[in-house]
């Protein structure tokens, strides 16, 4: 193996793209800030039992584990920042009994990629709200998610909605055990209605519940899905409440193209209610995903309502505006010492100044000029 080779699905970010990413990150955090979201920076590595909440089984498969040479305990390299933010809200910010609005933008590392086209080191950015159970909180986060997409040239963005509360209400009413619910959840993702029908028939469920589960994979499409669902699903208060929340989101974004899928349930995840995602043209998967995950902080001692979204900022590469390198002022190597004060003054003003050693350099080909002493004063002389 060549010493310069990197592991599969791991890549360097070179200067052109690095400038784009850093600019996008700054814009994103500024957007979050003016909406009241405070930046947190959790550590890249924690004790494994803190990272693996046992709520999201899939997270354990993504998390790289190592042994801490200091304590002998098992450490994990984070694969998702949300459990860390839940820990911060539950423990470090527990003095605030009201709403905590938090945001982040940092790298995570996956033991295996989510797909052939996905990287194992995403730059995960997101925003989360803790302490507010009302649907207005979800609407605020969805609005912020859609605004985040405008940092890049995404074109028309599709908002996709689901609600795991409908499936769970039906599961409880039909008295499914945990194993049956997990099996049915997995089948729902494939939208294989025949297999779903065969499974509920094998379990000999009551006809009303068997019909409802068989119907869920067919309830997808535009806003009209909600009225269809109201007329065909069992009249359960939890189902009606979930449909009401979906309707509230649709009403909040009248000009947005919306797709509703009542069998979009995200197997092996920590979400508990409304699910939302943003899709854009030419992306093989959702650009951003979010949803409600009430109670996640309970693993850390304080269960609270929570909703939020995240995305891989590196996936924006190719859609971000070009950030040209700042033209540099050159100073001859033999003049560097004498011109030191003038050089530092220019740098404090934000001007890039590079010492020219006469052997070529990787500065912008478009130079701002050269620092020369004219009439006893160091001045930038244009070429």
UniProtKB/Swiss-Prot annotation:
GO terms for cellular component: cytoplasm. Its main location: cytoplasm. It is found in: Cytoplasm. Keywords: Amino-acid biosynthesis, Cytoplasm, Histidine biosynthesis. Required for the first step of histidine biosynthesis. May allow the feedback regulation of ATP phosphoribosyltransferase activity by histidine. Heteromultimer composed of HisG and HisZ subunits. Belongs to the class-II aminoacyl-tRNA synthetase family. HisZ subfamily. This is ATP phosphoribosyltransferase regulatory subunit.
């Amino acid at each position: 193996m060549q010493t310069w080779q990197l592991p599969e699905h791991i890549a360097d970010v070179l200067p052109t793209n690095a400038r784009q990413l850093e600019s996008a990150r700054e814009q994103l955090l500024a957007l979050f800030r003016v909406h009241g979201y405070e930046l947190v920076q959790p550590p890249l590595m924690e004790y494994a039992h803190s990272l693996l909440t046992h709520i999201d089984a899939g997270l354990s498969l993504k998390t790289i584990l190592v042994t801490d040479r200091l304590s002998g305990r098992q450490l994990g390299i984070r694969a998702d920042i949300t459990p860390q933010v839940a820990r911060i809200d539950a423990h470090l910010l527990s003095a605030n009994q009201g709403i905590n609005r938090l945001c982040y933008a940092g790298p995570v590392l996956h033991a295996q990629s989510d797909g052939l086209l996905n990287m194992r080191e995403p730059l995960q950015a997101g925003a989360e709200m803790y302490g507010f159970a009302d649907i207005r909180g979800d609407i605020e986060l969805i609005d912020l998610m859609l605004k985040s997409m405008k940092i890049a040239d995404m074109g028309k963005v599709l908002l996709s909605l689901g609600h795991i509360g409908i499936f769970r209400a039906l599961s409880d009413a039909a008295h499914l055990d945990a194993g049956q619910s997990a099996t049915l959840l997995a089948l729902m993702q494939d939208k294989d209605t025949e297999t779903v029908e065969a499974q509920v028939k094998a379990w000999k469920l009551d006809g009303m519940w068997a019909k409802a589960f068989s119907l869920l994979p067919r309830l997808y499409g535009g806003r009209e899905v909600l009225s269809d669902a109201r007329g065909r699903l069992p009249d359960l208060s939890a189902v009606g409440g979930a449909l009401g929340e979906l309707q509230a989101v649709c009403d909040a974004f009248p000009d947005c193209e919306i797709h509703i899928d009542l069998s979009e349930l995200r197997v092996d995840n920590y979400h508990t209610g409304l699910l939302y995602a943003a899709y854009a043209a030419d992306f093989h998967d959702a650009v951003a995903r979010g949803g409600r995950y009430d109670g996640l902080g309970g693993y850390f001692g304080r269960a609270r309502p929570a909703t939020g979204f995240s995305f891989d900022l590196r996936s924006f590469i190719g859609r971000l505006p070009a950030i040209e390198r700042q033209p540099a002022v050159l100073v001859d190597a033999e003049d560097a010492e004498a011109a030191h004060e003038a050089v530092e003054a220019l740098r404090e003003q934000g001007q890039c100044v590079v010492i020219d050693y006469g052997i070529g350099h990787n500065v912008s080909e478009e130079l701002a000029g050269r620092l020369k002493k004219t009439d006893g004063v160091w001045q930038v002389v244009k070429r």
